[in-house]
């Protein structure tokens, strides 16, 4: 992993508040429980977050039928919704919005717990199918951050959509060309462009 590169780790709290809820009570009204092969999971239903989490986990489950070791990286799930501040930052965790999931915890999963080399070793054995399934459904992976958080997946479809655009051969279209242009989406697209550009 490259030093001081944290793709998708930056958070736009104005966007998060607008899309997922701007207070604990507002966020909690947006939470739903999804039933998965890994158990019942509480997640935010806005912006199709819960629906896409279910799709990602269903896809991982199917892959685990061919490789049972995959589930060792998933179960038990360490957590989703937890209204809290990130230590030493004063900023809300994405778990506070119900848009992040921590899969099965390993002592080498977090940059504050172990040296970089141990994190790199853990990333090297992490099943690609888990990462690919989550990214396919709009999640960024904390294992791609130099401040690694390997068990962490965070729902940020706007980042995935924009990243895919910049890796496609034809960049003539705007990154948001296939997103319906209702008032809410236009407001969110403008926020994203303002923060990323």
Model-predicted segments: where are they?
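Cell-envelope/glycan interface and biosynthesis
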Residues: 1-144
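Low-complexity, Gly/Ser/Thr/Pro-rich intrinsically disordered linker/tail segments
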Residues: 136, 149-197
């Amino acid at each position: 992993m490259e030093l001081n590169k944290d793709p998708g780790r930056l958070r736009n709290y104005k966007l998060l508040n607008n899309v997922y809820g701007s207070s604990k009570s507002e966020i909690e009204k947006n939470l739903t429980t999804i039933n998965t092969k890994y158990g019942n999971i509480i997640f935010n239903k806005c912006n199709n977050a819960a629906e896409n989490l279910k799709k990602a986990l269903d896809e991982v489950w199917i892959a685990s039928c061919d490789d049972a070791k995959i589930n060792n990286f998933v179960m038990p799930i360490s957590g989703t919704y937890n209204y809290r501040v990130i230590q030493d930052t004063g900023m809300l965790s994405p778990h506070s919005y119900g848009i992040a999931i921590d899969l099965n915890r390993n002592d080498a999963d977090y940059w504050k717990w172990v040296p970089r080399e141990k994190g790199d070793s853990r990333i090297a054995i992490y099943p690609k199918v888990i990462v690919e399934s989550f990214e396919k459904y709009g999640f960024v992976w904390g294992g791609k951050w130099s401040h690694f958080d390997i068990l962490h997946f965070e729902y940020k479809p706007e980042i995935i959509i924009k990243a895919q655009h910049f890796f496609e051969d034809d960049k003539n279209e705007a990154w948001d060309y296939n997103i319906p242009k209702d008032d809410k989406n236009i407001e969110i697209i403008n926020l994203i462009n303002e923060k990323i550009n």
